[in-house]
């Protein structure tokens, strides 16, 4: 069952044109001379690059998923960088010529959205030339989070400190197709931030977007490929709603269409991190919460544990298509489902051990055949020490490459970024602590929308 309230409220959000670019890539021939110089200037073509930051060291990572190269940059060394900041998320545009980085609020600094120009890159030398193009302050120093107070009321659902924000955190970057606009969400409040990625400005008169009852604790407004519908997640305890928006790319308006509940008032799933679109109408999302908290409504009989849901944005309904399992070899969601992706007819679920009574004991990547989207068929679960590196935990985010050949899966706890080959469902490349990674987060592959 679902809640789907149709409203006529119009919210202006800037929209123009975001053009699809050529799928050409710069790649290394295995037989090339060792002195071959990879092209330095990255523009006008879709590039095989992904970016991430490091929670612990504050580094910026650039991964080349074509030739498996890695470049590590200390952003403090870039002229114009605003200081020693706790970094959060990244975005790289399809051409690979511009990177956006967000930072958390501190007593000394506001939360920032920082635009970097990529002047040139040398994968052989492991260097990149970056220029600060803009530093956009999203608030004032010392701005606290606005998350609801929540307490544990049973042994099944603790309240971990990592999810209770201490100040403004800017998450959920998404690109609106066929426009010049990039969106971020402050999951710690109710604000959607809108950036013109051509001018590197917060859009005057439009930013921030605040819609009471909708934009609170959102982790990204995820648009379909045509840029006509956006889905907002509920990234906090007892938020069981997916917000549905209609965007007008020409006028910049966003119509609030309604909300889809993951279940009904008595039994529902809650706390969703990401949405993945299947086509122009259908999408999937996954939940993370195990049981009730102090925020749970008195009318709620049960919180449905971590599960996967098929969203019909035309009918405004949600159908549970993958249930929870208590067994590591079970045919369901074993840990909290943090992220998901659908490529080559298969559903991939990043499972993280962060919301139960243990923390980071393990982490898995579950794979299902999605030939029948209403009835996924379990294929296998990639496990630490077997399919994944020993000690691997907390599969947090998935960023597919634009050709769907690889999935880049990041773990901010165990320090790994994995390249999964979707043809064989095996790990094709491991970047980890031995390469200098500590707590990588905010993985974003060029050519993706989020």
Question: For the regions a protein language model found, what residue spans apply to each?
Answer:
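An edge-strand/N-cap motif at the start of beta-rich repeat modules
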Residues: 29-74
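Short loop/turn segments immediately following beta-strands, especially the blade-tip
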Residues: 62-69, 115-128, 194-202, 244-253, ...
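Beta-rich catalytic cores
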Residues: 86-88, 169-171, 188, 217-219, ...
